[in-house]
Amino acid sequence: VERTIKGIVVAGTHSGVGKTTMSLGLMAALRCRGLAVAPFKVGPDFIDPGHHAKVTGRAGRNLDGWMLSREANRDLFARHAAGADVAVVEGVMGLYDGYGGGDEAGSTAQMAKWLGLPVLLVVSAAGMARSAAALVQGFERFDPALAFAGVLFNRLGSRGHLDYLREAMSAYVDAPLLGGLLRDEALAMPERHLGLMTAGEHALSEAACHRLADHIESGLDLDRLLADLPDIVPADVEPVGCSISCFERVRIGVARDEAFCFYYPDNLDLLAAAGAELVTFSPLADNRLPEGLHGLYIGGGYPELHAAELAANDAMRRDILEASRAGMPVYAECGGFMYLCRELEDLAGEVHAMCGCFPFRTRMHGRLTSLGYREVRMTGPTILGGKDEVARGHEFHYSDIVDRHQWSPIATAYQVSGRSGGLAAEGYQVDRTLGSYVHLHFVSRPDCAAALVSSCRACRRERDQEEG
């Protein structure tokens, strides 16, 4: 008998309606009922999937209509929904918001149709009554091909407010009204400059998860939602496993702490499948790199918030610089790239010493300096692949390089274009150390993971020859 699961996409009419809180609450309520929940997030965001993982006990996975193809998204969904009872997909922005005004590309609606899942539409009822029915009717009719599981009102002023909304909805909207939740600011997730606080900074306690679950159960007809969701059979996918012999396996150190926490789990899975043993370490707390490494992966995060502590850890900075100079492959993205540079200047103008693998100083600004999807074409051989190989990712940061022009001998490794085109030189490689502001999703080019592991394997062989 084929195992079936149920799946739902949680979407909002627009950003700020409480979509993340509702998604987390739904995941928590389902788990409190004893159901295994597979969490997903539409878009390139790192923070929401971290909270999903805290609530569900399963890694939060990203689905994305630009970084990844339709087939890749469907494959990831099938692979990571397998074994769960319910898959919950948190949308991005408003339901129909995508890359442009002319079509659905990149939208939550597009992803829902790609996956064949119905939508639970979250609507903020604050300041609205009968007008809410007009709003929902517009969303319902905008794309007849999209299936709606129901509507959930958030931020009700009172239970009487919900009665008013129910009367209006029954007259004008086909999608079932599955409930409404009273305004509760205590449940809002705290934010900082890159969005919500990370799961590491604002860890949801077991008590907080139960509060979220109780909040959802108090106003959402979860029994009806589950009963009405169709049973789906996840598509068969090839298992991701490692067939590399132990003699060819390599150890890659992955930086994991409050300063470096932004990784797509699928990137790590692909590295493991290519033959890497992943060993976590903390540039903040550890004095030395783990023993026996053949490569390093330093992801993004918030080095600017921990710059003094990172600078004070001289031993770790020295270890990383020596590993880089010795030819160990080192790959760093965004915050990790900032850490590999010579210095980091914070918002107060204070300059902190970093690793020095690259000669640059990066400077924090009080505004975004870059945001958007990126396509990377490699201009020559790199530790992620050869000349003209292409991968996709995302860029989102408040810093930049302040002295790039002084270091013209440092060649760029990428030609980077945005979703709408335009080329810029970016990415920096010195020997086998590669750093960039772009967060790549390796599923857009799985060969990147294989190439990085291959570079680490070459490092291992060189070391073995020196020692032998």
Short names for language-model regions:
Residues G7, L35-A38, R249-R251, E277, ...:
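Residues that mark the start of a beta-strand
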Residues K41-V42, L177-E185, E277-A285:
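Beta-strand->loop->alpha-helix junctions that form or flank phosphate-binding loops
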Residues A112, F247-E248, F260-A272, E277-V279, ...:
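C-terminal and late-domain segments of enzyme folds
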Residues L117, A175, R325-P329:
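A short helix->loop->beta-strand "cap" motif at the edges of active sites that frequently abuts
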Residues A129-I244:
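Internal gly/pro-rich beta-alpha loop/helix module
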Residues R249-R325:
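Phosphate-binding active sites in nucleotide-utilizing proteins
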